[in-house]
Amino acid sequence: MKKLVIVSAFLAVSNITKAQNAEPAVQWGKEIENLQPGKSNLTQILKSDAGGSYAIREQGSYTDHHYLLEKYDASFNRVFSTDVTPPVGVMGNSNLVNKILSVKGKVLVMCDGWNKAEKTGSCNIFEVSLDGDVAKSPIVADKAIAEKQMKSASYFYDVSDDGTKLITFAQLPYEKDATEKGRLKCFETASMKELWSNEIDFAVPADKSPDNTIIVANTGDAYVLKKVKMDKNVWKYAMYSFASGNMKKDEVEIPEKVFNSSKMVINTKGDLVVYGTYATGRWTGNESQGSVYIRVDGITKAIAAKKVEPWANELIKAFMESKIGGKAGSVIPMEFKYMIPKNDGSVIAMFEDNKMDKAAVPGSTTFQYNYTYTSGSIMVLCLNPDGSQAWNNVVPKFQEIKTASETRLFDSFCYGMLGDRLLVFYGNTNVDYKWKDGAGRELYKESIFGKRVVNPTCLVMIDGKGSMKGVDNYYGWKEKTGLPLLKFMDGATFEMSLNPATFYQAEDGIIIYAEMPGQQRYKIGKLKL
């Protein structure tokens, strides 16, 4: 059985619902040997363009962990694989890799530094060229005094959509009986010149687990969404906007509601959009009673739109008809997965019905469990710039996978955009072994999808008006909401093997990363236009 990881997303499927063979072809590269099978995994696609594709591979043990930058040419042959792990330093003067970011023209290895003698934590940035050359010394983007390493500042980052701006946010060390503080800095990535910096006093009691979300626009303007728990089920919210470092604060009133799950994007008009779900009273898991929409004008930084409303009855009904469990009523138990900006300034929000169950392994002397991960339907909402709902739809599906791992390594679906059309890819684990077509003939799954296919990878398309396009009749297949991607599956397949962590929107196709059993060999291909 092969393992499949989708690692980028953009697919032009011409007339995909007009014919059963409307699937584009797949171009596969040559198989490549994995030099450290079992200890080496591709974890991130950084970029893919006419110059080639770049990926990060992690390998080694916890105490000897390495990061490799890999380049692949247009035919998906490996050009090089080079270690870009910065020097970890020595005891009392160390660098720990926090995150690896792709910016315009290079790669940034973001490290948390600690200097015991100075009692300072720092944000250290190592620049890496696209040829794999690592800078000998880091750019020290920020420093903060701390009593000890475990109590030093925490650093968070964001890169603008065009890769030209970087922000670093230092969550400054907790101090008892003091107010919470942070420091936000913006850099131009070409020269790594600091454009502006701002010290933030949030004017609320310091918290050991603060809740701040950051984002930066192509202009270098930045935003911080602040959530503060004041008391049991009592929260305060504020939006901090920064234009050239000048700060503007707006209190966001969401009375008697817990803004429990939210995401932020910069829409195509340059405005900030915040969207999420709320719960009233005690919040449990992903349950929500409604949604919160906020849009901040990209120029004036004023809150241009805000809408707080319960889920509509028709939406609850549509979701409940295809849900995998839970109680009916006004609560929708779903996970907020993605928010995607559209070309007209609207955004798409995607939610999924997820559940995890575990059962003790019979006869085991230690605490061992078997896990069942169930993923149900996807609820898709399109929101206008004023927060009103343009349309909604539900992608009905049922996926179940059983494993001994308490961590779900792969997600249940991935997405791509083709103009204003949304493409949803998922591994269909609910296909019968055999069925009858319209003529009464018996058909077998392996005769249609191939013996190597455990579960077919399927595609659903939702057009710009919210209409879902599936397959009216595919060999009499009962699951009519997805087009099985036969050519896509020919190279590699594995149940529910869609990994958004390595899902990258390229300009001219879907890049597929296929790993063989035992991780000894792998190959990369592209689902072409």
Residue map of PLM features:
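Bacterial Sec-dependent N-terminal signal peptides
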Residues: M1-A25
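Beta-strand-rich domains and repeat architectures in extracellular enzymes and scaffolds
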Residues: E31-Y67, K165
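Structural signature of eukaryotic scaffold interfaces centered on beta-propeller domains
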Residues: N41-A50, L96-G105, A153-T164, N212-T219, ...
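Short beta-strand elements that form the blades of beta-propeller/WD-repeat-like
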Residues: A50-Y62, K99-E118, T164-D177, G220-K229, ...
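Beta-propeller blade signature
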Residues: L68-A74, S122-G132, K181-M192, W235-N246, ...
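Blade-loop segments of beta-propeller domains
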Residues: N77-E118, A141-K151, D201-P210, E251-E256, ...
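Conserved blade-ending motifs and adjacent loop-strand segments that build the rim/top face
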Residues: E251-S262, V308-A328, Q389-F413, V453, ...
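Loop/turn-rich, solvent-exposed surfaces of beta-rich toroidal or solenoidal domains
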Residues: F336-D357, V361-P362, Y369-Y371, S375-M379, ...
